[in-house]
């Protein structure tokens, strides 16, 4: 049986592990976090990505985890409602659409559950070195003993360790978009009822939306700065920057900054894209944000990750023992769709205007997935 190690147990990694296992691979998953990484924003599964969930037998379960958000309010700095929208929301788009909006960690839990019977998980560990001799890849880990695998899949996100080890430094491939954003869990102190509330200040944005049947909420804070560089691992520097920029901008920012410091799942990063001419080298391939991050601003990151995992595993199956052909066909089948979805980020649109919904839907549905 062919062996593969997948690095990164988020959406792309767990989906790839599922499909590789289903297609006959012995799969090992390595994840730096001690368990599944908690938290994350509301994410969307759209168009053909819904077909991927259905083929995994997870569509009904994903629908059960929908946020069921009914709409959004937009307020001034004193909390007075300026207007409300019951047709679409900033996080999920049209309210009455076939798309599924759910929390990131809920989707990952579903994917993890689907892989558990057949996938070996190495939590609290990471790949240290990769040595591809043409016949196999020798992988050393920070904790586990070194092993050899037929293939290595990097699904370890925007700041991919596998990409760095095989292709080189992140700066070669990253396109920074200038928006810095934080997301974290807070109590539902606004008593939101399947609802979102947003305030746009002069230079910052803050939003809160209810989660888990109104028992808690997610907070989002964001600002624009094309010159700022903060290490994505330096939480204290992130806290300080958010405090400096947000404290005077009104609404409930003071409460959010208070909750921020004790949140169990605080996440902060600059919105970025990863642009690569190729997603594989030798016996190593990338999937999801590691190879072609669209950024959360595209609204398509999760769907692209699910589709990429499905197509990567499917093309490897179709190619039999010829992994090079499988990797090449994965790129040929998918790179056009990736490019169209990366184009969705508004800095590509004249004047930064929102993309018309019709054009967005055209791009979402601009791929037909095969039966592998």
UniProtKB/Swiss-Prot annotation:
<dbReference type="InterPro" id="IPR002938">
    <property type="entry name" value="FAD-bd"/>
</dbReference>
<dbReference type="Pfam" id="PF01494">
    <property type="entry name" value="FAD_binding_3"/>
</dbReference>
<dbReference type="InterPro" id="IPR036188">
    <property type="entry name" value="FAD/NAD-bd_sf"/>
</dbReference>
<protein>
    <recommendedName>
        <fullName>Uncharacterized protein MT1298</fullName>
    </recommendedName>
</protein>
<dbReference type="InterPro" id="IPR051704">
    <property type="entry name" value="FAD_aromatic-hydroxylase"/>
</dbReference>
<dbReference type="GO" id="GO:0071949">
    <property type="term" value="F:FAD binding"/>
</dbReference>
């Amino acid at each position: 049986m062919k062996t593969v190690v997948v690095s990164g147990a988020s959406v792309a990694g767990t989906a790839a592990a599922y499909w590789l296992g289903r297609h006959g691979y012995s799969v090992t998953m390595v994840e730096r976090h001690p368990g599944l990484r908690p938290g994350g924003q509301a994410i969307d599964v759209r168009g053909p990505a819904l077909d991927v969930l259905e083929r995994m037998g997870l569509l009904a379960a994903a629908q059960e985890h929908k946020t069921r958000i009914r709409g959004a309010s937009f307020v001034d700095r004193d909390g007075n409602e300026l207007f409300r929208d019951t047709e679409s929301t900033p996080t999920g788009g049209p309210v009455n659409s076939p798309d599924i909006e759910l929390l990131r960690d809920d989707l990952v839990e579903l994917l993890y559950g689907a892989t558990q019977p057949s996938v070996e998980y190495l939590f609290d560990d990471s790949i240290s070195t990769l040595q591809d001799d043409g016949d196999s890849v020798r992988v050393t880990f920070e904790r586990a003993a070194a092993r050899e695998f037929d293939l290595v899949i990097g699904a370890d996100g925007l700041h991919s360790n596998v990409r760095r080890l095989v292709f080189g430094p992140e700066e070669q491939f990253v396109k920074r978009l200038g928006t810095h954003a934080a997301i974290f869990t807070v109590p539902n102190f606004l008593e939101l009822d399947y609802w979102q509330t947003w305030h746009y200040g002069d230079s910052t944005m803050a939003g809160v939306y209810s989660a888990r049947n109104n028992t808690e909420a997610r907070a989002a804070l964001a600002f624009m700065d094309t010159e700022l560089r903060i290490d994505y691992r330096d939480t204290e520097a992130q806290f300080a920057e958010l405090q400096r920029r947000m404290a005077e901008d009104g609404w409930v920012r003071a409460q959010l900054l208070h909750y921020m410091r004790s949140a169990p799942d605080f996440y902060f990063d600059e919105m970025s894209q990863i642009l690569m001419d190729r997603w594989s080298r030798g016996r190593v391939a990338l999937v999801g944000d590691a190879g072609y991050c669209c950024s959360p601003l595209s609204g398509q990151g999760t769907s692209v990750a699910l589709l990429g995992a499905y197509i990567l595993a499917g093309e490897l199956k179709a190619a039999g023992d010829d992994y090079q052909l499988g990797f090449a066909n994965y790129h040929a089948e998918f790179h056009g769709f990736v490019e169209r979805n990366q184009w969705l980020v508004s800095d590509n649109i004249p004047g930064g205007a929102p993309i018309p919904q019709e054009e967005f839907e055209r791009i979402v549905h601009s791929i037909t997935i095969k039966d592998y």
